[in-house]
């Protein structure tokens, strides 16, 4: 259904596949790639980045969850900045930073988006900030101007 809807990428939570899912992560990655889609792996706030290292050569982006998945409007978890920096530095040191983007999802606000970008965030998911603002277009333009 995602492909039919026009998706150009699919991401999934590594935690959902590492222990109890029927398909191991590598099989899902291959399924996504065979359909000519970009593949991303998502990390919950408490999951260490190290769990993804063995998959880096196969993916296009990492989704760093900056809130616990489940519902919108949660507050940004400040320790996410350190995790983004850790991932960014690792990718730079491995000389693969130009191949893997860092997406940050959850609690992105006008007060913290610059810190997220400075730490290495490439794609910011700012749902509540945008859709609950008086002027969503102005909010997006302000964030994009940075």
Regions found by a protein language model. Name each.
Residues 1-41:
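Glycine/small-residue-rich loop that forms an oxyanion/phosphate-binding "nest" at active or ligand-binding sites
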Residues 15-17, 42-46, 67-68, 105-111, ...:
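Active-site beta-loop-alpha junctions enriched in small/polar residues
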Residues 10-19, 63-75, 119-139:
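Glycine-rich phosphate-binding active-site loops on the catalytic face of alpha/beta enzymes
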Residues 3, 26-36, 83-95, 141-144:
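Surface-exposed amphipathic alpha-helices with a cationic face
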Residues 10-12, 39-43, 62-64, 100-106, ...:
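Hydrophobic faces of well-ordered beta-strands that scaffold small-molecule active sites
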Residues 1-4, 47-59, 106-124:
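Catalytic cores of alpha/beta
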